[in-house]
Regions:
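Polyampholytic low-complexity alpha-helical segments
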Residues: 1-990
């Protein structure tokens, strides 16, 4: 018996064939099983003959139209099989040739017979089967599931024999059913460029996707909408400003023009809109400022100056026009000289003094604002002697001081100074370093006019200033309320920072948009030391000003770094504070003295990291403070004791600070409910608040401090029972509810530096709840209600925002994963009060922790304080990465350089000297002076030609231009402490 049935004997094979053929005949009688939607042809039943050959193990079924199969194919298969067996047995080449010819002939006949077979014809039903593939899908070209042998592979190439032409011959165009490059094929098609508008009915509820909208048509519709609204309500200033900003959006669609032309056309459009708006709103100051800014961007300096002069002649009392006229001359490299600018200030003062008789309060404020700007200009040009004489005479005239007041003699011995200069000149330093060191030494020591007898020893005629030289800048202030403002301006000119620096204070003093007046690093210290009751984040804030102190970004005499005149200048500032404060009423006097005590605290904070510790400075300060507090007028002033306690804390005496605060609380009545005087009650609540904040401070915090807070707060109620804490909570809650029920009073800010009673009550209540329950959500809800309630009183709302940020920063420093509320509160506050220094310090720290790719500096509008905070954040990030040796440090450095380039193109802040000085400091720190030093010098001088410190810093960045720098200083008549004769000697010597 064979293993396979195919190789069994013939009888079995024949019987099996008969059975199969009989079965197939019976099955083919019905053709229902062949019914199919794609094959509807009638199929006749046919007789199938299946030949199972013994030569193969496979069953071959072949069909035909008339005769299904014949024995020919099986016969041929038999012959090919036997022939292949015989071929293996033959050894001679002749026999193999004969057999191969015979097999080839058989194969050829078999191919021709298979081609002659008829094919079935049927109707094709291909509806909804085929479609035109118009969208390329690259996934169809990948055959990842097949092995490499199953994938089709084509070699297409052209080969040449002999010479190959240098010019590439174009390949023949293959007529294929697909295109090689669909994009190229679409581009070569002739397109219909005529835009045909189709009228379609769109359902109102149907939302059109963003990629379907026609942006240009949308902008046209929006322009039409603005025009219609402005026609209906031309007095809407906010709508006019939005329409002006909208022109920047339209400029993005003008791609057919150059960038410079687009910018100019946009400014022209804005100018025409502003002029139309001023026709309807002639009294709007904001629109007038925009008009002057746009005029300055499209006109040369000389033409712009003439245009403004024409406007000033029409409206001589308009301070905005006077400021623009002065700035047009001051900011022009060609026109700026010190005498020209001072002549314009003189004319302005004369007109404002004449008009002050009609409305004293208004014109006194304008006169003081212009006086402050004039003093800042004198400081920038280096004319400290002239500046101080102007301040002194104005204070004597308006504060009723003695004629000999504020007169300081022999600040420093001139002979010692000459000896120091000789040591510098004898050193073999480069010429630029010799000049810089001599200039800075004299600049630090000279700020007061010398007498006529000392002039012969000094030899510098510009150091001798008499009252007649500044008589044009000395004017009486008619309204008595303006004396406090004059005192603040006088101290700001001496480089005393505002402590704290709030948005409302800057706005009230007119310093929000005064970008060209910022030239020295002292204004940056409130970023590191805000003085708003902060309890956390001290090291993070101090890291923001890293390198600023070492960079010597100061001007004139300074109180930060050690030099021969540091202590004399500090004594000079203290004496000025005391003289001004003692000549003011009680409330304003307290403001000035609190400001001075905070300034002393700031100096202690900054001196902690000095490499050389001077115990004499601390001892001298303590003796000065004790002498101040021993006076009868100051002995019972709780504000002064609070500030003295905080100075003790900064000196490292924490226990002494707590004892002073507790003693001050217990010195008088400890129950606020029993005090009727508003100021005394405010001072007591502020003591409680300061004590709580000091105990919760993260630098000195202990777990026992919470228990101490709960013990101290019991003093607020007179009853001493077991339920004392509940009574305190009820009392504070009632105070907060009364605040929410009554409308807060919107009054002028006369207390810039004194605490606010409502704010301190809310802070004490929230700190008590936080210590007792540790529930931050409850605290946030209270602040939200209070902030919403006092939205009509901006200075109080800003204080409450600060207090909320303080407690949130404390909480999220302990729980860093949950800072969502902090971020939300921060951005809400910056939207309303963008120039609050405490909020900006938190914002700068968060920016410094971001990677470079996450920082977006494409915003077109910056305030000068926001720009400075971004600079500090970038410096902190770059320094930190450089210390780690991280590759991202260079990306951060490039990002910071790019940020400075953006500032140089922003009209509102590009004239800020301090931004340019920080830019030059960055070049010095990272050895980029050779690449960018000369370029930055030319750009900075073109935008700030009056700022003497720009030239001083440029001598370090671009020392090869020293001679040119010195010549420009003399041409502009800026202050140069090295006389021309000494300068010639230095030039000839080296």
């Amino acid at each position: 018996m064979s293993l396979f049935p195919a190789y069994s004997n013939e009888n079995v094979t024949e019987s099996s064939n008969d059975n199969v053929s009989q079965q197939l005949r019976e099955d083919n009688t019905s053709a229902n099983w062949l019914s199919n939607s794609s094959f509807q042809t009638y199929v006749q039943s046919q007789t199938l003959v299946v030949d199972i050959s013994s030569d193969s193990s496979d069953n071959d079924l072949s069909t035909s139209k008339d005769v299904p199969t014949s024995n020919t194919s099986s016969h041929e298969n038999k012959h090919s099989y036997y022939n292949s067996i015989k071929l293996d047995k033959l050894h001679t080449s002749e026999e193999r040739k004969k057999i191969s010819k015979h097999t080839k002939k058989r194969k050829k006949e078999r191919r021709s017979s298979s081609k002659k077979k008829d094919k079935y014809e049927y109707e094709r039903d291909v509806a909804n089967v085929y479609f035109e593939d118009k969208h390329r899908d690259r996934g169809n070209s990948t055959v990842n599931t097949l092995c490499s042998r199953a994938r089709p592979y084509y070699n297409v190439g052209q080969k040449y024999l002999g010479f190959v032409s240098y010019k590439q011959i174009k390949k023949n165009i293959y007529q294929r059913y697909h295109a090689y490059n669909i994009d190229l094929a679409e581009k070569t098609k002739k397109k219909d460029i005529i835009i045909k508008r189709e009228i379609t009915t769109i359902n109102k509820n149907e939302q059109i996707p963003s990629w379907c909208t026609n942006l240009e048509e949308e902008q046209t519709l929006k322009t039409r909408e603005y025009n219609e609204k402005l026609m209906e309500n031309p007095k809407n200033i906010k709508l006019w400003l939005e329409y002006i900003e909208f022109q920047d959006t339209l400029a993005k669609f003008q791609k057919h023009q150059l960038a410079k032309n687009i910018q100019r056309s946009t400014v022209l459009r804005k100018l025409s809109i502003v002029e139309k708006a001023l026709e309807k709103n002639s009294d709007c100051i904001e629109l007038l400022k925009l008009k002057l800014r746009f005029m300055g961007e499209i006109s040369p300096a000389d033409e712009f100056s003439k245009e403004i002069e024409t406007l000033v002649n029409k409206d001589t009392g308009n301070i905005i026009l006077w400021q623009a006229l002065i700035m047009a001359t001051q900011g022009s490299v060609a026109m700026c000289t010190v005498p020209k600018v001072l002549d314009l200030y003189t004319k302005c003062f004369c007109i404002l003094r004449q008009r002050s008789r009609t409305s004293p309060r208004i014109y006194d404020e304008r006169l003081l604002e212009m006086l402050y700007q004039c003093l800042i200009f004198l400081r920038h040009t280096g004319l400290w002697e002239q500046m101080w004489e102007t301040i002194r005479l104005n204070l004597i005239l308006n504060l009723n001081l003695n004629r000999d007041s504020l007169v300081f003699k022999k600040i420093i011995d001139e002979k010692k100074l000459i000896g120091m200069e000789e040591v510098v000149l004898m050193s073999r330093l480069p010429l630029n370093q010799l000049w810089l060191r001599t200039e800075s030494l004299r600049e630090n020591c000279h700020w007061i006019s010398v007498s006529k007898e000392e002039l012969e020893l000094v030899g510098d005629s510009r150091r001798f200033v008499i009252p007649e030289d500044v008589a044009d800048f000395v004017h009486p202030i008619i309204s008595r309320d303006s004396n406090f403002r004059m005192a603040i301006y006088s101290l700001l000119v001496l480089k005393i920072p505002l402590l704290p620096t709030r948005n409302c204070i800057l706005k009230n003093l007119g310093l929000k948009e005064f970008s060209w007046g910022v030239d020295s690093s002292e204004v940056l210290f409130p970023f590191a030391y805000p003085i708003v009751g902060e309890m956390a984040g001290h090291k993070k804030r101090k890291a923001l000003i890293h390198g600023i102190l070492e960079g010597h970004l100061t001007s004139g005499p300074q109180y930060l770094k050690f030099h021969p005149a540091q202590e004399p200048y500090l004594d000079f500032i203290r004496e000025t504070f005391h003289t001004i404060a003692d000549s003011l009423p009680n409330l304003e006097r307290n403001n000035i003295y609190v400001w001075w005590l905070r300034f002393e605290r700031l100096l202690v904070f900054l001196s902690k990291d000095e490499p050389l510790k001077y115990d004499n400075k601390g001892k001298k300060l303590k003796s000065v403070l004790k002498e101040f507090l021993k006076k009868d007028v100051n002995r019972n002033n709780l504000h002064f004791y609070k500030e003295y306690a905080l100075i003790e804390r900064e000196m490292g005496r924490f226990e002494s600070c707590i004892n002073i605060l507790e003693t001050a609380i217990q010195s008088n009545c400890t129950c606020p409910s029993m005090i009727s005087d508003h100021e005394e009650k405010a001072a007591l609540f502020n003591l409680y608040r300061t004590l709580f904040e000091t105990l919760l401070n993260t630098e000195t915090y202990k777990e026992s401090h919470k228990e101490k807070i709960l013990n101290v707060i019991k003093y607020m109620v007179p009853e001493s029972t077991d339920t004392q804490l509940l009574l305190v909570e009820k009392y504070l809650r009632d105070c907060v509810n009364n605040f929410l029920k009554t409308e807060p009073m919107s009054k002028d800010i006369d207390t810039f530096f004194l605490p606010n009673l409502d704010s301190d009550i809310i802070v004490c209540y929230t700190l008590f709840l936080y210590v007792k329950n540790n529930n931050i959500e409850e605290v946030i809800n209270i602040y939200k209600c209070c902030i919403e309630h006092c939205k009509e009183v901006p200075h109080l709302q800003e204080m409450l925002y600060e207090s909320e940020l303080v407690i949130l920063q404390l909480h999220y420093e302990n729980f860093p994963d949950l800072d969502n509320n902090l971020n939300k509160t921060l951005y809400d506050m910056l939207e309303l009060y963008p120039d609050n220094f405490y909020a900006l310090s938190i914002y700068a720290h968060k920016q410094s922790e971001l990677p470079s790719w996450k920082i977006n500096n494409t915003k077109s509008e910056f305030s000068v304080w926001k720009a400075l905070s971004l600079c500090l954040a970038g410096r902190k990030r770059t320094h930190f990465l450089m210390q780690l040796g991280h590759d991202a440090a260079y990306a951060s450095l490039n990002k910071l350089l790019s940020l400075h380039r953006i500032f140089a193109r922003t009209p509102e802040i590009r004239s800020c000297p301090l931004l340019w000085r920080i830019y030059m400091l960055l070049l010095r720190e990272y050895n980029l002076c050779e690449k960018k030093g000369e370029e930055v010098y030319h750009e900075s001088v073109a935008l700030c030609p009056w700022a003497r410190n720009i030239y001083i810093d440029a001598a370090e960045v671009a020392p090869q231009l020293l001679t040119q720098i010195q010549d420009v200083i003399r041409e502009k008549e800026l202050r140069m402490h090295v006389t021309p004769e000494e300068l010639n000697i230095l030039r000839g010597h080296l």
